[in-house]
């Protein structure tokens, strides 16, 4: 059953020594009142680990979108994690289905 607003994410990544770009996309229909947290990572100079450059939490209540930023989240939610796009998609999908 589809409820809530449609959320679509598409990302594309092409590195110097790859011929085919890596693309990943996901579509979610969040349930009313469900929290969605999105962290964006950027790798510079092929660093061994990446840190989040932004965090956004969104919640839909009665069709109205409310947002908070990472400064409103607790310290436990700020731990940097390195995930591939596929791992991120799987983790978000898993949390949305809880």
UniProtKB/Swiss-Prot annotation:
GO terms for biological process, alphabetical: symbiont-mediated suppression of host innate immune response
Manganese keyword on record: no
Keywords: Host-virus interaction, Inhibition of host innate immune response by virus, Suppressor of RNA silencing, Viral immunoevasion
Domain of life from the UniProt record: Viruses
Region (Disordered): 69-98
Annotated InterPro entries: Gemini_C4
Positions with biased composition (Low complexity): 79-90
Coiled coil spans: none
Family assignment from sequence similarity: Belongs to the geminiviridae protein AC4/C4 family.
Function: Pathogenicity determinant. May act as a suppressor of RNA-mediated gene silencing, also known as post-transcriptional gene silencing (PTGS), a mechanism of plant viral defense that limits the accumulation of viral RNAs.
Name assigned to this protein: Protein C4
